Amino acid sequence: MSKRLESKYKINRRLGVNLWGRAKSPVNKREYGPGQHGQRRKQKPSDFSVQLMAKQKLKGYYGNISEKQFRKYYDEAVRRKGDTSENLIDLLERRLDAVVYRLKFAMTPFAARQFVSHGHITVNGRKVNIPSYIVRDEDVIEVREKSKHLAIVLDAAQSGERDVPEYMEVDHRQMKGRFLRAPKLSDVPYPVQMEPNLVIEFYSR
C-alpha cells in the first residue's frame, strides 16, 4: 500500500475536519492532529494558511491527490472558459474514481481508486483502470459482471451514509450509472465546506 493511501487515516485529524462525513472518522474522537498531545492555543491564521488549508482539504477529499496532478487540474481549470473555481470542481468530479465513489460503488475515495485500478470498472463497455480518467457527459460507468457480487460493492451500494448527486444517475440492481452533466459547486454533496476560490488564490499568488 502506498504512503499516500496509508495517510488516509491521518488526513482528517491533520486537517481537523471530517472530510467524508463518516461516523468512524478519527476527528470525531479528538480534535488535534496526529502526533499532538493536546490542543494548542489558536492563533488567527494568515491568508496563506487559510488558502493552504482549503487546498489540502480539496486534495484530501479526492483521495489525497498528488500535488503535481492537482496543479494540472488548476492549470486546466484556468485554461477553460468560465469560472475557474467551478471548472476545478467539475474536473475533480469527473475523475473516474470520484464518479465510482459518487455512484456508491465504493465506500471511500481510496477504495474507489483501488477498485478502478484493479480493473473492476467499465466506461461505455470498455474496461478502464486509470483512476484519473476524465468521464464525459452521458458516459456509462458500470461494475464489471464478475465484480458485481463483491461484498465491498454491495455494502457501498446499500450504505445510507450518502446519496447519489443529481448530476449522475444509477441503477444499483445492474450496478450501472451515467454521468449526466457538469456539476456546480452547490450541487456537490461535500460533508464539509469546500472553498475552491481560495485554492485559486493560493496558486495565483
From Swiss-Prot:
Q: Name one GO molecular function term.
A: structural constituent of ribosome
Q: Which Pfam families match?
A: Ribosomal_S4 (PF00163), S4 (PF01479)
Q: Does the keyword Flavoprotein apply?
A: no
Task: Name any GO cellular component annotation.
Answer: small ribosomal subunit
Q: Residues annotated as region Disordered?
A: 26-47
GO BP, sorted A to Z: ribosomal small subunit biogenesis; translation
- Spell out the CDD domains in the cross-references: S4
Q: Which UniProt keywords apply?
A: Ribonucleoprotein, Ribosomal protein, RNA-binding, rRNA-binding
Q: Would you identify the family this protein belongs to, as annotated?
A: Belongs to the universal ribosomal protein uS4 family.
PANTHER family per record: 30S 40S RIBOSOMAL PROTEIN (PTHR11831), SMALL RIBOSOMAL SUBUNIT PROTEIN US4M (PTHR11831:SF4)
Function recorded in the entry: One of the primary rRNA binding proteins, it binds directly to 16S rRNA where it nucleates assembly of the body of the 30S subunit. With S5 and S12 plays an important role in translational accuracy.
Q: How does it assemble?
A: Part of the 30S ribosomal subunit. Contacts protein S5. The interaction surface between S4 and S5 is involved in control of translational fidelity.
UniProt-recorded name of the protein: Small ribosomal subunit protein uS4
